[in-house]
Amino acid sequence: MVFGTIGFSFIEGKTIIDSAYFVVVTMATVGYGDVHPVTTPGKILAVVIIVMGVGTFLGVIANITEIMLAKREMESRMKKLNMVIGVFYSEVGLGLLASFSRYDPDFDSIRPDLIVNANWTDKDFLKANKGSLSYNYSVDILRVDLPALKNFLMEKRGFLLRLLENPVLLEHQSFTDLLRAVFHVTEELAYRNTFIDTPEADSNHLATDIKRAYHLLVSEWIAYMKYLKNNYPFLFSLAVRTNPFNKNASVVIEN
């Protein structure tokens, strides 16, 4: 714009205002209008401006198209990712959450903040997330039924391995960390043939591994519930009715 204005002012001998008007008319109408260059250099400059204007327009269109395609691709990946996350919680996550929270001596202090319902807003999910991040997760390892936990996770070992191999998860670091934490607990338990007379140091080690997975399970569950609330109301309804933290949860709709 500045280049064209100065050029026409110098070549055609027009005022700055007339030159600016000339540039706008030339670019907007691709050279067609009541104003046109008289001199040969002016005509050449007009052609240059037209070409630059068309090039800029095409560049803008290309950028907009690229942004739209990238957004659509991202939405598609997010749908696939959350479908995988949903399968994980259905097969493994909900059972672990119910078990770990049952053995958490202080869980009742945070439980009310995790009773998700249909009236929740983004503000409620934010509050729940902040609470989950600041909460000191723990499990009473002496109360945990380690043989039952081992059997449960060993049954799901193949499923967890397939999830870890899923390329869709490469773009979701926090969920990948969750899978690794759960799989690590699986391996720790798998290598132990008995849990009778377990040394205190070993019990504490297992408690730390479970705590790591427990914390990540809750955080990712909150994010997943928010996604369902905003995108899939029918799936969210079932998720609310199977909330592992709600002692009164029932899949049956009473009213």
Place the predicted regions along the sequence by residue.
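Pore domain of cation channels
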Residues: 4-73
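Short amphipathic alpha-helical coupling elements at transmembrane boundaries
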Residues: 22-25, 83, 87, 162
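Non-catalytic, well-ordered alpha-helical scaffold segments
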Residues: 42, 62, 79-86, 90, ...
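Alpha-helical membrane-embedding segments
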Residues: 45-63, 81-86, 103-120, 238-243
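Soluble C-terminal extramembrane regulatory/interaction domains of multi-pass membrane proteins
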Residues: 145-255
